């Protein structure tokens, strides 16, 4: 595991925000995939304020999501809705740079539409940067243990939460693995045990998608806070 440990979650998101500035200064579109969850909320809040809101050249950044729940953007469960509320409402970014999963649509229709958008905008399927979280069950995006097909050649998949049955759309493992860079942003003491297990056990012996999904031709790194890393 390629880990970087920060004193707090805020330190970790500040590092990511600084990297957004650098990516935005490249003279070409940069495709970044965002994650849901509590730590990314901290990231979006940080990006919406000085100095980052002013320093980032937003027109060069294109935003996507690793997954989203099939709910309208106004629903508190919507990953896109969280970013809109905490970040997009506070900055100037071209509407065409935001590539959301339309959770208000019928899932099969939206799966097809989203895959078509992915193919049209990123024909080679290679994201510049995919930021992922990890649940205490080892899931990432909406790819859950014991139900993820790691060989699925599609770009996206309809997934069902194993407990709630809630329907989501997620990027597939294969699409994620094509990225130039994957960063798992994992914070909090509740993740310490599973991180220890991932660090000490070969991925093929674990059911956790977060342990298995790595950039095939790029960099995979784990940004942790001290609480999450306490057993490493």
Give the residues covered by each predicted segment.
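Ligand-binding beta-strand-loop-alpha-helix segment within the catalytic cores
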Residues: 56-131
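Class I SAM-dependent methyltransferase SAM-binding "motif I" and its flanking Rossmann-like core
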Residues: 130-174
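A glycine- and small-aliphatic-rich helix-loop capping segment at beta-alpha/alpha-beta transitions
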Residues: 46-56, 81, 145-153, 201
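ATP/nucleoside-binding phosphotransfer catalytic cores, i.e., glycine-rich phosphate-binding loops
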Residues: 180-232
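Glycine-rich N-terminal segment of FAD-binding domains in flavoprotein oxidoreductases
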Residues: 26-51
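Glycine-rich beta-strand-to-loop/alpha-helix junction loops that act as flexible
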Residues: 34-39, 132-136, 187
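N-terminal glycine-/serine-/threonine-rich phosphate-binding loop
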Residues: 1-32
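A short secondary-structure junction signal
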Residues: 111-112, 141-146, 194-198
């Amino acid at each position: 595991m390629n880990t970087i440990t920060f004193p707090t979650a805020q330190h970790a998101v500040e590092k990511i925000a600084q990297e957004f500035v650098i990516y935005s200064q490249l003279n070409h579109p940069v495709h970044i995939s965002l994650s849901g969850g509590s730590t990314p909320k901290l990231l979006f809040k940080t990006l919406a304020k000085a100095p980052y809101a002013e320093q980032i050249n937003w027109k060069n950044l294109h935003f996507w999501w690793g997954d989203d729940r099939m709910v309208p953007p106004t629903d508190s469960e919507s990953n896109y809705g969280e970013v809109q509320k905490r970040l997009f409402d506070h900055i100037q970014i071209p509407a065409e740079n935001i590539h959301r999963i339309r959770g208000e649509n019928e899932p099969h229709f939206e799966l097809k539409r989203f895959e078509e958008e992915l193919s049209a905008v990123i024909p080679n399927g290679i994201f510049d940067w995919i930021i992922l979280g990890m649940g205490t069950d080892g899931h990432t995006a909406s790819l859950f243990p014991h139900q993820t097909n790691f060989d699925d050649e599609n770009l996206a998949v309809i997934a069902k939460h194993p407990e709630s049955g809630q329907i989501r759309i997620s990027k597939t493992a294969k699409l994620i693995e094509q990225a130039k860079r994957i960063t798992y942003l994992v914070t909090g003491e509740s993740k310490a045990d599973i991180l220890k297990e991932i660090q000490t056990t070969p991925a093929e012996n674990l059911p956790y998608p977060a342990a298995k999904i790595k950039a095939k031709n790029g960099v995979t790194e784990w940004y942790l806070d001290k609480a999450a890393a306490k057993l490493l």
